[in-house]
């Protein structure tokens, strides 16, 4: 029987480029060689698609963060939209095109903008090529934390209080220094309590997130908004929640299937080898092996475990999720469960919660990946 040919996309234009490369390596290692043939397609930081680059199978976090770059043997990928799965080609040095063969399904191991935000999903919808993961609407809505909260509130699912700023209306020439008082006015008007977390609405892996602790510090707030605006013009200012951050992996293999939730886990901060140790930022996620460890299931008791799983399923269904996601929640000391965000293509590195959560339930990551691909093809 012919193997299913899976185009694994990695890299991309987003800040999470390197994490995408590592996730792609994990996905490729999880592909059952008896069932699937991987066709790795890299995307450079400037957006060029290529084949015949470095082998992603050689990448891992222990050796640092890789980058999808062309090699002397690389060839640019050209898509012919109307040809569907036969529309993947490689451009030769003389300008001629070679077919990459029929692509049965795409596994977009891409995080952040241009990969997790509905844009590439729309491309494959137009091509008529099946792909793993959430569709256009769910991807776009969950990439934008503001609109995620709009949808979740409408579904009656609690979220953290906050405000949204359109920084295009303010003066970035002085890094918003003259706008700090206006930002502070809006924070006070909304009744937000400190500490505040200021974050880009459309970014992942904790890029651009700043914690503001000093009450009434307009300068610190302005600086935090400017840092977030470097990643997205839409910026969220959220009230810090005195809670534990509990993450829950979910899957829905086929539209008629119920959403399934894995055992929730918690990333426990230990210590940072250097820098601020107060929240789980990019460095403590990926660059500092001593910063944290993962506990699955989270040590929150059976009742809260069940409620987190139920909330994660409700949140995923509320945004019409499909395939896979990781739902990040806050669990307060009073037992309240709030949704922080939904990651429609969660990190799948060796230290990431999504693969570990299923493994903790006795379900190998290879089985999950096989199910996701077969579900996309159904």
Swiss-Prot record:
Gene Ontology BP terms: cell wall organization; peptidoglycan biosynthetic process; regulation of cell shape
Co-factor: note: Binds 2 magnesium or manganese ions per subunit.
The keyword Ligase is assigned to this record: yes
A molecular-function term among this protein's GO annotations: metal ion binding
Residue positions binding Mg(2+) 1: 328, 341
Binding site for ATP: 189-247
InterPro entries with a match to the protein in the record: ATP-grasp, ATP_grasp_subdomain_1, D-Ala_lig_Van_CS, D_ala_D_ala, Dala_Dala_lig_C, Dala_Dala_lig_N, PreATP-grasp_dom_sf
Key word Cell cycle present: no
Cofactor(s) for this UniProt protein: Mg(2+); Mn(2+)
Keyword terms, alphabetized: ATP-binding, Cell shape, Cell wall biogenesis/degradation, Cytoplasm, Ligase, Magnesium, Manganese, Metal-binding, Nucleotide-binding, Peptidoglycan synthesis
Top-tier EC class: ligase
Extent of the signal sequence: none
General function of this protein: Cell wall formation.
Similarity comment: family membership: Belongs to the D-alanine--D-alanine ligase family.
Protein's UniProt name: D-alanine--D-alanine ligase
Species lineage: Bacteria, Bacillati, Actinomycetota, Actinomycetes, Bifidobacteriales
Name of the coding gene: ddl
